[in-house]
Amino acid sequence: MIQSEEDLEYERNVEMFRLKRLIAKLESMKGSGTSMITLIINFKDQINIHARMLAEEVGKASNIKSRVTRQNVTDALTSTLEKLKLYNKTPPNGLVIFCGLVQQEDGGEKMIKIDLEPFKPINTTLYKCDSVFHTEEVRKLLEDNDKFGFIIMDGNGSLFGTLQGSTRTVLLKFNVDLPKKHGRGGQSANRFARIRIEKRRNYLRKVAESTTACFITNDMPNVKGLILAGSAEFKNDLQKSDLFDLRLQPIVIKLVDISYGGENGFNQAIELSSDALKSVKFIHEKKVIGKFFDEIAKDTGKYVFGIKDTLEAMDMGSVDILIIYENLEYNRLILRDANDNIVNETLHKNKCPSGSKYKNETTGVEYEVLDNIPLTEWFMDNYKKYVSHLEIVTDKSSEGSQFLKGFGGIGGILRYKMDTDFDDTENNNEWNDDDFI
């Protein structure tokens, strides 16, 4: 089944958030000595080369004088090698492995073993044996991948470029010699006016044709948005012109007045459009939350919000799009009672047990805690069993902030209308820390 661009965007967003959380965890870990191994394999590299290298490193580790350090490093290298042996060949986007003994809060140590297939190609090869995990190259995967097009035009010429992350690229530039307004009267003035109008029209046609050549690939825009920048009315004339490609008109996100042309104008246009570019990054988030708000405004009954009702709707299989705030303050507990029955509960972080035992305050039943993970992570690992799409949102956009404050940061768009009795405290936005399921 071929996935739509919208489906792929949902999945990319989840993978980005998953990696973001993993990096934060890895960066919080510390080890004693140099027993924490970071191995990054370029997508072009061969697995067996790195397997041989690790085997050689195990041999070298036998020369470490400290018995404890020698054992820790050897264990970490062996664990890394075991992870590597799970792969017959390098995955399409490369491979990242983190292995090593990590210090725990209780003073003990725990062996961490993580293998990661990046969601986009990684071009770096790295091997480090240190007291920390090295995440710098993996963090680069989180950098903004959206590409924006810029058209800089004035009476002297035009420049076409792109901005992707912090990389600025000039695609095309050309000069033009437009006649100035003629000061003399009579027939001469009329003739020069006609020539001037014709040359401006030809210039506009060349800019429009170049715009299509630069920013259309395979019959589709190859940039997320377009910025039209320039002095005078050239940029406005281009946007209004019937020569301007209809496929590009919907992605024009801003018109910018600048004082310069050429590359100086390009730099100025980037600076002056920063707010608009930042806003575009949240377009998908704003669109999904907007759909949720529309269902509520129209009172369709095809919406749900709040921890309790949303999880119940998920269990019934009625949620199409699950929307959650990225920093939900709830955990998902997997519990076992005295009769070996497995029970799931969702608790606010303030109410979560710190040890291996948990007593339900309402029923008085005691449980053994088998697992206790942030609810956001549980959603990321399990959402495909319950819903079509998962959207993880921030509070950076106005819609995201409203969703967090007004609906507790969790809700869903339903496949069909449900008769749901919403909890009064949730309807009144009085979020009860004791709320659990």
Swiss-Prot record:
Quote any Pfam family the record assigns: eRF1_2
Biological source species: Didinium nasutum
Which GO MF term does the entry hold, naming one?
translation release factor activity
Q: Which gene encodes it?
A: eRF1
Superkingdom to which the source organism belongs: Eukaryota
Name of the protein in question: Eukaryotic peptide chain release factor subunit 1
Q: Which UniProt keywords apply?
A: Cytoplasm, Protein biosynthesis
Q: Where is it found, in Gene Ontology cellular component terms?
A: cytoplasm
Concerning NCBIfam families, the annotation shows: aRF1_eRF1
State whether it acts alone or in a complex, and with which partners, per the record: Heterodimer of two subunits, one of which binds GTP.
Location of this chain's protein in the cell: Cytoplasm
Its function, per the record, reads: Directs the termination of nascent peptide synthesis (translation) in response to the termination codons UAA and possibly also UAG and UGA.
Q: Record's family?
A: Belongs to the eukaryotic release factor 1 family.
